[in-house]
Swiss-Prot record:
Pfam families for this protein: UPF0547
Similarity-based family: Belongs to the UPF0547 family.
Keyword Coiled coil belongs to the record: yes
Coiled coil: 42-75, 102-130
Origin: domain of life: Eukaryota
Matches recorded under InterPro entries: C16orf87-like, UPF0547
Keywords associated with the record: Coiled coil
Protein name per UniProt: UPF0547 protein C16orf87 homolog
Biased composition (Basic and acidic residues): 49-71, 107-118
UniProt-annotated stretches for the region Disordered: 49-118
Amino acid sequence: MSTNKVKKVKMATKSCPECDQQIPVACKSCPCGYVFISRKLLNAKLNERSGVMDKLEDKRRRTERIRKEKINLTSTSDMENRRRSRTNSHSDPIRRGRGRPKTVGLKKQEEEKEKQEREVDIYANLSDEKAFVFSVALAEINRKILGQRLIL
């Protein structure tokens, strides 16, 4: 009752054109002497021949988009009327704007100007004695910083 079952392994094979023998695909030559030409060799030979063609293809873009011709359904007089009507609509101030409003930038500039004016006003009311005290304090701070060699 013990029967040995032999599993057949199916391989990818190719047939030799000279002797019609089945040979594994990985083999480059047949035992009869026939040599199979690899695709790499074929491509190399084709590339040598098509050297001139490659130069022509290099000038062209590889990915060219197919452009469809637009059909002009409107006549030129209609287009002129549309252009005129659009120019009139631009003068209307009731346009709904998208995105950030333009006044935001102006407000920031006004705030910066006000800050500068405030700073100028603060120092303008400073007495001569206070200005002298502050200048001495700043000189002392600068001397200490330079003594530490923090600023190179």
